[in-house]
Amino acid sequence: MSKTLTHLQQLEAESIHIIREVVAEFANPVMLYSIGKDSAVMLHLARKAFYPAPPPFPLLHVDTTWKFREMIQFRDRMAAECGLDLIVHVNEEGVKNGISPFTHGSALYTDVMKTEGLKQALDKYKFDAAFGGARRDEEKSRAKERIFSFRSANHRWDPKNQRPELWNLYNTRIKPGESIRVFPLSNWTELDVWQYIHLENIPIVPLYYAAVRPVVERDGMLIMVDDDRLELKPGETVQHKSVRFRTLGCYPLTGAVESTADTLPQIIQEMLLTRTSERQGRLIDHDQAGSMEKKKQEGYF
């Protein structure tokens, strides 16, 4: 008698199939590890896909040098515990030129330290496929992107020239220099991710849990004072509030939400009641209309 899979089991099976398909079809895949909750789920699925062997590809983190300190500590611990090779790439030219979110703005900073940094790493190590944790429910440009997303030799994405995806059949053919970005969590929602983390007891960065943290209110967002590089503007004062993060990125560009949810069941309950996107807290999404789609066309994940 066949067993009916639950909703989460169906999502898990689809994601594991996608991960295995990439390993079977590509010569040199890599998993982008941004240290957030989606990366945590994706890494967990990859470990399941090849258990008891480790995943047959490295992790890649594009370090902008502005991530939360707790994220970097968590990244190093997880890589060591999983026994995986961790490649950390920094755009040294950007560092040399002093590119920062404060002095150059979020758009230029993201382009130099994230997009260009990612393209440098993919070219340097000659990866032909890269896993990412993006989901279709996050943002409108991601909603229309394929699971196997073709990139030109310049890493560009053309939303008007996407390959058909019928059922679970994926076109993996590329020419030398071209690559594919692969999104195993495309069909997951934010709530699915949290419920799966709870079900599988997946470790996540403590910043997702509510705690009293030092923040400043800036441009309608609560920005955490993570180190002494955050300079206060006139009239700003540091406040200590109970906050958590729904999404994690570079700390000067990521807004916290006031919350007392310090357990997974409480976070899930919040998700059931919220009516705003998790990416409302990401300043880079507010640069201009169609901001994310423009970034993706230029090579952003």
UniProtKB/Swiss-Prot annotation:
EC numbers: 2.7.7.4
Please name the SUPFAM superfamilies in this protein's record: Adenine nucleotide alpha hydrolases-like
Q: Does the keyword Iron apply?
A: no
- UniProt catalytic activity: sulfate + ATP + H(+) = adenosine 5'-phosphosulfate + diphosphate
Q: Which Gene3D superfamilies does the UniProt entry name for this protein? A: HUPs
Part of which pathway? Sulfur metabolism; hydrogen sulfide biosynthesis; sulfite from sulfate: step 1/3
Record's keyword terms, sorted? ATP-binding, Nucleotide-binding, Nucleotidyltransferase, Transferase
List the GO biological process terms: hydrogen sulfide biosynthetic process; sulfate assimilation
The UniProt GO MF terms for this protein read: ATP binding; sulfate adenylyltransferase (ATP) activity
- Give a short account of what the protein does: With CysN forms the ATP sulfurylase (ATPS) that catalyzes the adenylation of sulfate producing adenosine 5'-phosphosulfate (APS) and diphosphate, the first enzymatic step in sulfur assimilation pathway. APS synthesis involves the formation of a high-energy phosphoric-sulfuric acid anhydride bond driven by GTP hydrolysis by CysN coupled to ATP hydrolysis by CysD.
Give the protein family.
Belongs to the PAPS reductase family. CysD subfamily.
**Subunit details:** Heterodimer composed of CysD, the smaller subunit, and CysN.
Q: Which PANTHER family match?
A: SULFATE ADENYLYLTRANSFERASE SUBUNIT 2 (PTHR43196:SF1)
Q: What is the name listed in the Swiss-Prot or TrEMBL entry for this protein?
A: Sulfate adenylyltransferase subunit 2
Q: Which organism is it from?
A: Geotalea daltonii (strain DSM 22248 / JCM 15807 / FRC-32) (Geobacter daltonii)
Q: Which gene encodes it?
A: cysD
